[in-house]
Amino acid sequence: MSAPSDPAVATHPQAGAAAAASSSSGLTFKLHPLVIVNVSDHHTRVKAQAACSGDGASSAAAGGQPPRVFGCVIGVQRGRTVEIFNSFELVLDPVSGTLDRAFLEKKQELYKKVFPDFYVLGWYSTGSDVRDTDMQIHKALMDINESPVYLLLNPAINLSQKDLPVTIYESELHVIDGSPQLIFVRANYTIETVEAERISVDHVAHLKPSDGGSAATQLAAHLTGIHSAIKMLNSRVRVIHQYLVSMQKGDMPLDNSLLRQVSSLVRRLPAMESEKFQDDFLMEYNDTLLMTYLAMFTNCSSTMNELVEKFNATYERSTARRGGRGAFM
């Protein structure tokens, strides 16, 4: 998924925080979902804490606006490819707008011990637009990375927007009014995932409240996803079939190009009537029935063993009581 190519985000040019349409550096950015999850979680926690405290600690919270959060993004750069893997939070002085350098260096050192190949690539924040004060924070990180990136997450919910509310900016030196100034320019990015991230994100996306049942299990979520995919495939096939029937009856004009595409699509599907398919299908079907039968048989055996053990324990206690009473008499 690429970043949205919106118009330029304009800010005060004297602050050096104007955002041009697109970057000209030629770098390729790959963003991992863990970063988006971390930034979203950071914003949600700070917003919830501000709502619970109700003391109006920050001016943003006091004005009814969601508070901004700040942090660093880390990853690797291989040639012209920048891959952002993870992130961590930063402490910002709300009065002076400066970063806590001691906290930043400590966090950087700790992450270096766990991820020795990861470097600080830039920083992140939340909001709908680039602000004038963002360039001040951006310049403060240039002693760690001479060309840091700025990741901006918009926490506002926009149901009509299909793209991710995430924008990545680079800084470029432009001559404005005869003087060189740093400005933010948009950079395109793609979402890159590894197997562990795909499993985690899929689990979070299908997570349901635990009510003692099995609906929230991973198997149920997996089967639900397969069912939705098959249902969608079935609806698309029905649309194609209805269109072909209408074309055959003469209700729709003949489209040879579309017929070639349908023919190519049909050829990709496996031959469902072949003898080998029937043999393999019956073999897997019988194996599944056998596994189900063995599971039921094992469950019944376990239940029977528990019943026998309870019966023996009850019988032994009853025999002991009768034997003790006879010996006493």
Curated annotation (Swiss-Prot):
Enumerate the Pfam families for this protein. JAB, MitMem_reg
Check the record and name the CDD domains matching this protein: MPN_CSN6
UniProt signal peptide: none
Q: Please name the PROSITE patterns in this protein's record.
A: MPN
What domain of life does the native source organism fall in? Answer: Eukaryota
Please give the InterPro entries that the UniProt record associates with this protein. EIF3F/CSN6-like_C, JAMM/MPN+_dom, MPN, MPN_CSN6
Q: Name one GO cellular component term.
A: COP9 signalosome
Residue stretches making up the MPN domain: 44-175
The recorded induction information for this protein reads: Down-regulated during the early stage of iron deficiency (at protein level).
What does the entry give for GO biological process? protein deneddylation; response to iron ion starvation
Per its UniProt record, what SMART domains does this chain match? Answer: JAB_MPN
What does the record give under GO molecular function?
metallopeptidase activity
Its biological purpose: Component of the COP9 signalosome complex (CSN), a complex involved in various cellular and developmental processes such as photomorphogenesis and response to hormones. The CSN complex is an essential regulator of the ubiquitin (Ubl) conjugation pathway by mediating the deneddylation of the cullin subunits of SCF-type E3 ligase complexes, leading to decrease the Ubl ligase activity of SCF. Involved in early response to iron deficiency.
- Return the similarity comment: Belongs to the peptidase M67A family. CSN6 subfamily.
Quaternary structure per UniProt? Component of the CSN complex, probably composed of CSN1, CSN2, CSN3, CSN4, CSN5, CSN6, CSN7 and CSN8.
Q: Identify the PANTHER family for this entry.
A: COP9 SIGNALOSOME COMPLEX SUBUNIT 6, EUKARYOTIC TRANSLATION INITIATION FACTOR 3 SUBUNIT F-RELATED
Give the protein's recorded name. Answer: COP9 signalosome complex subunit 6
- Which species is this record about? Oryza sativa subsp. japonica
Q: What is the lineage of its organism?
A: Eukaryota, Viridiplantae, Streptophyta, Embryophyta, Tracheophyta
User: Gene name, please?
Assistant: CSN6
